Curated annotation (Swiss-Prot):
Acts as a regulator of the tubular endoplasmic reticulum (ER) network by modulating intracellular calcium homeostasis. Mechanistically, stimulates PKD2 calcium-dependent activity. Suppresses the RTN3/4-induced formation of the ER tubules. Positively regulates PERK-mediated and IRE1-mediated unfolded protein response signaling. Plays an essential role in VEGF-mediated release of Ca(2+) from ER stores during angiogenesis. Also plays a role in the modulation of innate immune signaling through the cGAS-STING pathway by interacting with RNF26. Belongs to the PER33/POM33 family. It comes from Rattus norvegicus. Keywords: Acetylation, Endoplasmic reticulum, Immunity, Innate immunity, Membrane, Nucleus, Transmembrane, Transmembrane helix. The chain crosses the membrane at residues 32-52, 101-121, 156-176. It is found in: Endoplasmic reticulum membrane; Melanosome; Nucleus envelope. This is Transmembrane protein 33. Interacts with EIF2AK3. Interacts with ARL6IP1, isoform RTN1-A of RTN1, isoform RTN2-B of RTN2, isoform 3 of RTN3 and isoform 3 of RTN4. Interacts with RNF5. Interacts with RNF26. Interacts with PKD2. Residues 2-31, 122-155 are lumenal. InterPro entries: PER33/POM33_regulator, TMEM33/Pom33. It comes from the Eukaryota.
């Protein structure tokens, strides 16, 4: 019976598989569109003016993907505090908020990388399922590229976490340079606390700990000036107080 189940890729064509999993297919298409728009922003082949519009399109497409994923995870919407608390635990809700933070802001290359790379990783995973539905030996070159992406997934997730962390001072810099809004750093701080507390993606939290260990190792060397050491220790203590408690 398992071989004839319509949800399984074995024995089903690629089109049938995608039609059976309509919501996953819709997210796959929106992620591919996000990758396309993000790439045209990072590599402005059509001009700088068009690049800015692709920046917005990428974030809007990512917001759509995040909303669909959030609906998939929590299908029964309720206007209650308990439902909101549950939604804020979901990574898809985090990146829905992320997209809304930056969609109308000054285009920043650093802010597009998490959107681009998450979309690429998730799209690659679903593409492999589509290829399996098409046939186990179909498109071997594409399969090789997807396997390389999967092999480097941890490094990509660490790079995304690095972007998430260093976007915090970037939003403050944008505020003082006149390119950001007054509320943006505060809303982004809320996003960062959600990422720090994420149950499914600990990379942001782990990277904070790794950065603290590296900085402490450097400033404890005898060659480090005393005022630099004191400033760094005070900064570490301040950031640690801002960090949310993780169960």
């Amino acid at each position: 019976m398992a071989d004839t189940t319509p949800n399984g890729p074995q024995g089903a064509g690629a089109v049938q598989f995608m039609m059976t999993n309509k919501l996953d297919t819709a997210m796959w298409l929106s992620r591919l569109f996000t990758v396309y728009c993000s790439a045209l922003f990072v590599l402005p082949l059509l001009g700088l003016h068009e690049a800015a519009s692709f920046y917005q399109r990428a974030l809007l497409a990512n917001a759509l993907t995040s909303a669909l994923r959030l609906h998939q995870r929590l299908p029964h919407f309720q206007l209650s505090r308990a439902f909101l608390a549950q939604a804020l635990l979901e990574d898809s809700c985090h990146y829905l908020l992320y997209s809304l933070i930056f969609v109308n802001s000054y285009p920043v290359t650093m802010s597009i990388f998490p959107v681009l790379l998450f979309s690429l990783l998730h799209a690659a995973t679903y593409t492999k399922k589509v290829l399996d539905a098409k046939g186990s030996n179909s498109l071997p070159l594409l399969r090789s590229v997807l396997d390389k992406l999967s092999t480097n997934q941890q490094n990509i997730l660490k790079f995304i976490a690095c972007n998430e962390i260093f976007l915090m001072p970037a939003t403050v810099f944008m505020l003082f340079s006149g390119q950001g809004s007054l509320l943006q750093p505060f809303i982004y701080y809320r996003f960062l606390t959600l990422r720090y507390s994420s149950r499914r993606n600990p990379y942001c939290r782990n990277l904070f700990n790794e950065l603290r260990i590296v900085v402490e190792h450097i400033i404890m060397k005898p060659s480090c000036p005393l005022f630099v050491r004191r400033l760094c220790l005070q900064s570490i203590a301040f950031i640690s107080r801002l960090a949310p408690t993780v169960a």
